Design a protein with these regions (language model features):
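Substrate-binding pocket helix/loop in short-chain dehydrogenase/reductase
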Residues: 105-107, 111-119, 145, 223
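Alpha-helical segment proximal to the catalytic Tyr-Lys
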Residues: 135, 179-183, 251
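Canonical Rossmann dinucleotide-binding motif of NAD(H)/NADP(H)-dependent dehydrogenases/reductases
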Residues: 14-45
């Protein structure tokens, strides 16, 4: 598909000096989120399981702290937060960006291992990071947690059950935490992206097309027929929304499930 049209967005303000942790932030949309915050003056630490992406990010952006690790593990979560606090101070913003595509398969063909792997990456990691972030945020009566879900959490996506279920659970995690933590001054929101342009969505499209017995180009064209703007989402679109939520303009926004998806009418 051709490049999507862009609407001009003013540079983010009001996030300078904030301490931000972004999980799965060495590549793809996560890296764009990290760079957008850093370019706006925030102090950013990100982590990623992909050692090669981590090494490349470290080489290219010395102003962003980057660690290698799996935040599906409690000890890694502790290490990530300890390092952010040591370098920069208390964490103001947590962006739970970790997520895997999971298997493309009929429900009867999904292994327990694949199911549990999706739960661990897409949901447990969010819980572990939020749990670690909350005590300090409570003590300061301030903080923002942003969970990355998916537009498919609302409309379903055949042959992608573990992905859709875990992304749907993130919506419940978000709304419940927003109610629980709001009295402590902590805001919690979810972003529901559409198909984010990049290598990952191309792999997903290829896998789904193969499962359906169609070409990748035909499946992508059919997918975008159900998006009102007829385009994929750019990583910069996701980053801009999250930085807005962290800015002074977003200080009264919590408990919201925000679609950044071109308006998904129905996801094939």
């Amino acid at each position: 598909m051709g490049a999507s049209p862009h609407i001009g967005i003013a540079p983010a303000t009001g996030v300078g000096g904030l301490v931000v942790i972004i999980t799965a932030g060495a590549g793809g949309a996560g890296r764009v989120i990290a760079e957008t915050f850093a370019d706006a003056g925030a102090r950013v630490l990100t982590c990623d399981l992909d050692g090669r992406a981590v090494a490349q990010f470290v080489a290219e952006r010395q102003d962003i702290a980057v660690l290698e690790g799996d935040v599906g593990e409690e000890r890694t979560v502790q290490r990530v937060f300890d390092e952010a606090e040591r370098r920069f101070g208390p964490v103001d913003v947590l962006v739970n960006n970790v997520g895997i595509a999971g298997p493309t398969a009929a429900v009867e063909d999904i292994s327990t291992e694949d199911w549990n792997q999706s739960l661990r990456a897409n949901l447990t990691s969010h819980f572990l990071c939020a749990r670690r972030a909350v005590p300090t945020m409570k003590a300061r009566r301030s903080g923002l947690i942003v969970n990355i879900s998916s537009g498919s959490a609302k409309v379903g996506l055949p042959l992608r059950l573990p992905y859709v279920v875990t992304k749907g659970a993130i919506l419940s995690l978000t709304t419940n935490l927003a109610r629980e933590l709001g009295p402590h001054g902590i805001r919690v929101n979810a972003i529901l992206p559409g198909a984010i342009r990049g290598e990952r969505i191309q792999r997903v499209i290829a896998s789904k097309a193969a499962a359906l017995g169609v070409t990748a180009a035909d499946y992508e064209r059919d997918l975008l027929r159900y998006v009102s703007l007829r385009t994929m989402v750019e990583p910069e679109d996701i980053a801009a929304m999250i930085v807005f939520l962290a800015s002074s303009s977003g200080q009264r926004i919590t408990g919201q499930l925000i679609g950044v998806d071109g308006n998904i009418e129905y996801e094939a």
